A protein has these predicted regions:
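A compositional/biophysical signature of low hydrophobicity enriched in polar/charged and small residues
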Residues: 1-138
Length: 138
């Protein structure tokens, strides 16, 4: 069971997963060891699954962010899933309900790369493209 203190710890870790336990403890009025015990419990329960980094794709030269909704031609999805795993530009892929089968979040360096990816996707089905013009949260 997660309590209010656990939520505060999780929120601090979401801001910076490299923060030291003693610094979290100062923030929430606990010892570093008590924070460590709570974090280990959250890890053991699978609530904390991994510690990772967030990249600024724009600073890496990938200035085109697009969301692509995929409408599969057939129900043979395994080839498509194998395909997207090989694409570094696909940073997220979700199977969705409603309109479409999948939605992809892609970062690309150029319009040409986007066109090439879209042409490859046509092998599997049609798509709807949405380009991000401004990030408002996250």
């Amino acid at each position: 069971m997660v309590d209010y203190t656990d939520i505060k710890i999780l929120n601090l870790l979401k801001e910076n997963s490299r923060v030291q336990w003693k610094d979290i403890g100062k923030e929430i009025h606990m010892t570093g060891q008590a924070v460590a015990n709570r974090i280990r419990k959250l890890e053991a329960e699978g609530i904390i699954r991994a510690y990772t980094i967030l990249l600024d794709e724009m600073k890496l030269g990938k200035s085109h962010l697009a969301f692509i909704t995929i409408f599969m031609k057939t129900n043979e999805h395994s080839r498509f899933l194998d395909f997207i795993v090989t694409k570094d530009s696909v940073v997220e892929a979700h199977k969705i309900s409603g309109e479409g089968c999948y939605i992809l979040k892609v970062f690309l360096e150029s319009q040409e790369q986007l066109n090439n990816l879209l042409n490859e996707i046509l092998i599997f089905g049609n798509y709807r493209l949405n380009l991000s013009v401004n990030k408002v949260k996250g």
